[in-house]
Amino acid sequence: MVPTVHANWRYFEMYDDSGNVINSWFGGGQDLTPYYLFEEDAMHFHQTCKTACDKHNPEFYTKYKKQCDTYFWNAHRYEARGIGGLFFHYCKETEDMKMENWFNFVSEVGNSFLEAYVPVVEKRKNVPYSAAQKTWQEIRRGRYVEFNLVHDKGTLFGLKTNGRIESILMSLPPHVQWVYDHHPEAGSEE
């Protein structure tokens, strides 16, 4: 019953031919994909993200949650990959946010990750589950794989630029299922 989580935080620099930095930016995020929704887990994860954001700008949580919900959308299925979180990219220096401010923000979000996720793991790791629930988990993991291989910009970039394939695919779950035209029973937990 432990949900899947995704997290990364990054910094990019571009250089000219002389080795001078000509552009730089931060990006990253963290999001949660439960197979069975426990409202208190969702609230805890999102509140932890919001608390981290609010320390830097009270508008960041709403903005970056919306970006997360938009980015992690499985368009071919018309469904979200999970319950969201934060997603931000191209965070460049402005009058209001110097690169040091962005570094502090990204560090705050990154440092909040364990606080957001570990309590959920601790609560759910020993919850018993049935064979039917395991099947549902693997079907949902299949949707996670679909997103990564069809929509995820980082995965697609790696695949199209001769990246290290094993490293790129290592983030995919080891056991998944696809059931043709599967629809959960109306009113079920799924």
Model-predicted regions and their roles:
Residues 8-9, 27, 69-94, 142-149:
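Aromatic/basic-lined ligand-recognition segments
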Residues 99-156:
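Extended, compositionally biased non-globular segments
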Residues 15, 33-40, 90-105, 153-155:
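A generic structural motif
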Residues 17-67, 183:
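Compact, glycine/acidic-enriched structural inserts
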Residues 1-25:
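Internal mixed beta-strand/loop scaffold within catalytic domains of large alpha/beta enzymes
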Residues 155, 159-190:
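TerminUS-proximal long segments
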Residues 44, 48, 59, 63, ...:
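Generic recognition of stable, solvent-exposed alpha-helical segments in well-folded globular domains
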Residues 10-11, 25-31, 169-172:
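Extended active-site and interfacial segments that coordinate phosphate-rich ligands
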